[in-house]
Amino acid sequence: MVVAAVFLALYAICIKFSSLEGIGSFEVLFYRSFFGLIVFYSVMRFKHITVHTVHMTDHMIRSFMGAGAVMAGIYSIAHLNVGLAMTLNYTSPLFIGCFTIGILISQHKGINWKLLSTLLLGFLGVVVMLSPTITPDEYFAATVGLLSGFCTAVATTYVKRLGLMKEPELRILFYLVLIGSLCGLVGTMLSGGFTIPTTTAALAIAGFAICSTCGQFFLTIAFSRGNLVLSGALQYTVILFSTVLGVWIFDDSVSLTAIGGMIMIVVAGISASYFTRQEKQKELHEKKHTEEGLQRHLRHQSARDH
């Protein structure tokens, strides 16, 4: 997971370089996605995995929300300090926690006050981090950064849903980069076309394309083979790496108050992931208990009939 975090931090740095060289956000989305499209489709062909699926609606929702998350993340990185932008991009556990609270209320199961308190801490951290740091003309970019976290949360729920449907991970990633490529291409054409890259921009494009693919690869390995709780906590090291690199390379200014807000968001994100997982395990346990009770009742009824 730490290796994945390093690649994702470098990905953010390369995006910042490309934006400074005049490469638009839609262009970045296209280059990033198209490189992934070539890689993932090639691996699918090698492993004899087809693109055909009977769950196309779920793939499309996941892919459009995922592409939206990537696009929003790219925009926020281009217009904010790298560390701040990456922190906002990693607020998805807070939104997933909000979804969980909403489900609990809709099912009349009461509120998980620990989870709710954690969410309040996280969103308070966002306010603390941004209030002394950004200027009024950066409010929109900060809002877009939060939108990235929201879109990631929705996309994540559909990734889990597709996983339960036994959809291969490569197929899920394929449709994400396919939609990302199409959205990036259309957006670029509508916003004036492609920019002829300078040497620095070309290197930045190659850098974020490679780093994003490598980061996604190691991220998948960490969550599929490692400890989920530990991996979930270690993924936040990307904020540390991004902040340090942003200060070192771009001379980003990060106040102590902003650092305090970042810490609040990280603590809240890790805690929200833990409490959300607890709620899901509790739900599975209750479902299993109900099914076992029903089976006992049916066996008892069958014995009485005989």
Which positions does each model-derived feature cover?
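Cytoplasmic-side transmembrane-helix entry/capping segments in multi-pass membrane proteins
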Residues: 1, 54-64, 110-123, 141-146, ...
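Loop-to-transmembrane-helix transition segments
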Residues: 1-4, 48-74, 140-148, 188, ...
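Transmembrane alpha-helical segments that form core, pore/gating elements
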Residues: 16, 40, 133-192, 284-306
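Transmembrane alpha-helices of multi-pass small-molecule transport proteins
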Residues: 21-68, 96-99, 151-155, 174-191
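C-terminal transmembrane-helix exit sites in multi-pass transporters
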Residues: 75-78, 92-116, 240-259
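Helix-helix packing/entry segments at the starts of transmembrane helices
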Residues: 85-91, 167-179, 216-248
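Hydrophobic transmembrane alpha-helices of multi-pass small-molecule transport proteins
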Residues: 99, 111-131, 257-276
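C-terminal-most transmembrane helix of multi-pass membrane proteins
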Residues: 107, 236-306
